[in-house]
Amino acid sequence: MYTPAPQMAPAPEAVPVQATPEPQAKPKAPSKSKNGDVGGFIQQCISLCSYLKELQTQAHLIHLNYEGGNFLGVHGFLKDQYEAHLEQFDTLGEFIRSMDYLMPMCAKGLADAGPGIQHVTSYKGTEMLAVYYKNLEELGMKTKKLEPLAAKVGAIDIQNYMAELCGQAFKAAWFIKATLRNG
């Protein structure tokens, strides 16, 4: 015997959709932030990300353009450095996102968020390294300034990372300083 199918398929039960939380609005500039303001702190972290991205590019270009008797050592060191700067940028960016703030959408936005770095103006190896050395020292100082701010807003993960990043920056600067003294 034939049993006809229903004329209309039963409608599936609607599954309730949970609301997706919206990310925080763009943080205020540090000069407009109140003491202990998370948005101002995040803006400074984004500025540090911009600085790290500039350092990555600088280390990579020096890596490509460096010439000298110690080429092999410097070439390898700078490769490690630009790879480290990419990892540092990514880690700090992930910390920012974990606090539900957005990163800039493009290179221009990222560059606008940062103070910029000292630029290399010579192809002479020692001069390129001297500029990079100064920028690494500045990176270390920036992390020292951000570490207590991270503690103030309760971002202990970022606080710990600032201490780690500070050590990495000053160690790399020491390597370059020792190279410049002997070469």
What are these regions (language model features)?
Residues 72-109:
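Conserved alpha-helical segments that form or flank metal/cofactor-binding pockets of metalloenzymes
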Residues 32-47:
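Short, charged, low-complexity amphipathic alpha-helix
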Residues 44, 48, 55, 74-77, ...:
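General structural feature for long, well-ordered alpha-helical segments within catalytic domains
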Residues 54-80, 142, 146-157:
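Helix-loop segments that flank and shape redox-cofactor active sites
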Residues 44-45, 111-164:
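Acidic/histidine-rich alpha-helical segments that form the ligand environment
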Residues 3-33:
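Acidic, proline-/serine-/threonine-rich low-complexity intrinsically disordered repeat tracts
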Residues 49, 56-59, 63, 89, ...:
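A structural signal for well-ordered alpha-helices, especially hydrophobic packing surfaces
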